[in-house]
Amino acid sequence: MIGLFLNLLDTQNEKDKFIKLYDKYKNMLYWISYGKTQSCQDAEECVQETFFYVAKHFEKIGDVNSSQTKGYLATIVTGFSIDVYNKSKKYGRIDIENNNIAENLSYFDNIETVELSSAIESVLSEEEKIYIYLKYVYGYKSAEIAEIYNVTDISVRKKLERA
């Protein structure tokens, strides 16, 4: 499967970097996804979707070992996992209160950011939190977020506006 992803990359350096990224994070992403979907098949599908998306947008990956890259990947796989879970159940939301992305990945470096994060965590829905992280932490455009979650750009902008 990794061969498919490598075909999306242009240079040998990118391919080598992708292999390192894949080897380093595939298990972590699987367990994050499995925690949300409670299904081995769905978790594997979400991990593959995550790496496919990353290969298509590989220019957004910085240092493979950085906490920002780790958080970026975790956010994407979480989004895919929630989407798969909701589609399979067709109702309800995933309770991930005890699985706070910010706490698990430690990508907040100072007190002000931690305070802002806790305010976000207590007020926003899970979908709004993910949109906020992708937009303001990782610099995604609303159109890119819409593409990830198969929703309209207008829907993403409205959610961000309400958040």
Regions found by a protein language model. Give the residues of each.
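DNA-recognition helix of helix-turn-helix
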Residues: 82, 143-163
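Sigma70-family region 2
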Residues: 10, 51-67, 88
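Short amphipathic alpha helix immediately N-terminal
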Residues: 122-144, 148
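A short, charge-rich alpha-helical start-of-domain segment used by transcription regulators
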Residues: 6-31, 35, 129
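Amphipathic, Lys/Arg- and hydrophobic-enriched alpha-helical face
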Residues: 22-41, 57-60, 121
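Structural recognition of an alpha-helix C-terminal capping motif at a helix-to-coil junction
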Residues: 31, 45-52, 56, 67-79
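Internal acidic/polar
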Residues: 91-121
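Arg/Lys-rich amphipathic alpha helix in sigma70-family domain 2
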Residues: 75-96
